[in-house]
C-alpha cells in the first residue's frame, strides 16, 4: 500500500497579482511537488463555484454580505489545511510580511508546525539588524525548527531535508 505524500501548506500573497501567480505556479509549486510533497494551496481550496456569485454582484450591501459569508469559508478552509499539513512554506516578501501570511505562520507555529520562510525580496524588512523580517514573524518561523532562506536552490535542499522526516 502506497503511503500518502507529506503535505506542505503554501502561505503567500502571490495569488493577488498576475506576476505573483506566474512565479507561484511556474516556479514555487513545481519545486515543492518535485521534492515529493503534496501542496495544500490556499488559492484553490475555495472553489470558483463559491467565489463567482459574490464577484458577479454589483457593489453594495448584498455584495458585502455575500463576501462576509465567503470570507468565513475561506478562513475555515485555510485553517483546516494548516491543521492537516506537515509543514508550512511561507513567502515573506514585501516591505512588510503580508498580514494573511503572517497569520498563517503564527497559527501553524501554535499548532507545532515547522515553518520555512522564503524571502526573494532584497529590500530591508526587519525591525532591527538582528532579524530578516518582523521579529515576531521570524520568531514563529523559527519556533519549531524553521528557517528563512533567500534562494530557491537552498529552499529545495531544505524541503528535501524535511521530506525525509515525514516520509
What spans do the regions from the language model cover?
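Conserved catalytic or regulatory cores that recognize and/or transform ribose-phosphate-containing ligands
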Residues: 1-167
